[in-house]
Amino acid sequence: MAASENNMEEINPVLRISQLDAIELNKALEQLIWSQFSSCFQGFKPGLLTRFEPEIKASLCLFLWRYTIYTKNATVGQTILNMQYKNDLAVTKKYRPLNKQQKVWFALFLVGGKWLEERSFDLFSNHPFGASFQRTKYFLNAISGLLKFGALLNFLIFLQQGKFATLTERLLGIRSVFSRPQDVRQVGFEYMNREILWHGFAEFLIFLLPLINTQKLKSKLFSWCKPAKSHGVSDPSLAVICKECCLCGEWPAMPHTIGCSHVFCYYCIKSNYMSDMYFTCPKCSSQVHNLQPLEFKIEISEVHTL
């Protein structure tokens, strides 16, 4: 079954975005491996790996190449996306894996090119006055510029034709194909619909909540939950009424009245009145006529009874 799938003719081309995603996944994997490897030497002397960093990175890339392209004809990113490399130099249209020469040259371009790019500065910095080294450095810089220009042209051609995402693939004659036939994908919009509903509901709440007077609503609920307590009118002192604020239920700080027989903290009544100009007493439903401080005398013995 696997042999028949590998030998079937290619029908569906690989998407450009899939090839670019595979390249990005490979770069992310290399960075992850290097970060994990360097974290193993955090307890050692600082700068221990800096001197040999290009060689260590090249060794790690060579290790990845050995167990991905050399054995499976596909990078890690291609394996995740159900892709692999095909020998495009073969005359037949059927799938042909990469030959050994293509794999070795791929390693030289991939690993050796990165190593030379990172190590070239150190190689020529120790011989700043040598004429031969200067010519070699100029020659390498010219080659590097030509390769970058060629990579740009190859990318533009890749966007048009959809083959050979990198210059290395075009030079070696290898391109990405699907490793297995693609099934018809069932596109579902459940997640998108749920996100749209939640975003719409959040925007509705952002528009609605500023229109609701929460302070007034809280006062109404407080008046319904705590009905008015009847106090004797014959009580000569206001000690019974003035022991607690009608809003917070605590001992009134800077007690004030609004014209009725009930007492409020200054902060409680002021904040409620500023948020609702039609504020009424939650116990007797009296409107605010005149906010004024309360002056009364209370015995110390009555305070200790609280």
UniProtKB/Swiss-Prot annotation:
GO cellular component: peroxisomal membrane
Enzyme class: transferase
Pathway: Protein modification; protein ubiquitination
Binding, Zn(2+) 1: C245, C248, C265, C268
Superkingdom in the source lineage: Eukaryota
Cysteine-cysteine disulfides: none
Cytoplasmic side of membrane: 43-48, 126-134, 213-306
Positions of transmembrane segments: 16-42, 49-74, 99-125, 135-161, 189-212
The family this protein is said to belong to: Belongs to the pex2/pex10/pex12 family.
SMART domains (UniProt xref): RING (SM00184)
EC number(s) recorded for this UniProt protein: 2.3.2.27, 2.3.2.36
Protein name: Peroxisome biogenesis factor 2
Principal localisation: membrane
PROSITE patterns from the UniProt entry: ZF_RING_1, ZF_RING_2
Keyword flag 4Fe-4S: no
Subcellular location: Peroxisome membrane
Membrane topology field: Multi-pass membrane protein
Gene Ontology terms, MF aspect: ubiquitin protein ligase activity; zinc ion binding
Pfam families given in the database record: Pex2_Pex12
